[in-house]
């Protein structure tokens, strides 16, 4: 898996595109929970997801039609 960087344009395995705003956010005082903040290119909505979940592999049993190996993959590096 290619490392995700701030500013990257990523594609979700379901086909939507997102801009990564931050890969170094933390929840409150718990600095062990790293978060990714990202913005929908379609709606402008802001989303936050734990880094490990953001970088996880697609469940091919649940989504056998998915072409991507990972939940999010780099579409364009800015």
Label each region the model flagged:
Residues 1-78:
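Mixed-charge, low-complexity intrinsically disordered regions
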């Amino acid at each position: 898996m290619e490392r995700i960087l701030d500013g990257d344009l990523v594609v979700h395995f379901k086909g939507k595109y997102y801009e990564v705003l931050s890969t170094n956010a933390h929840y409150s005082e718990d600095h062990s929970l790293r978060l990714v903040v990202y913005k929908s290119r379609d709606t402008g909505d802001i989303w936050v997801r734990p880094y490990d979940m953001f970088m996880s592999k697609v469940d091919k049993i649940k989504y056998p039609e998915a072409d991507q190996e990972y939940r999010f993959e780099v579409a364009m590096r800015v």
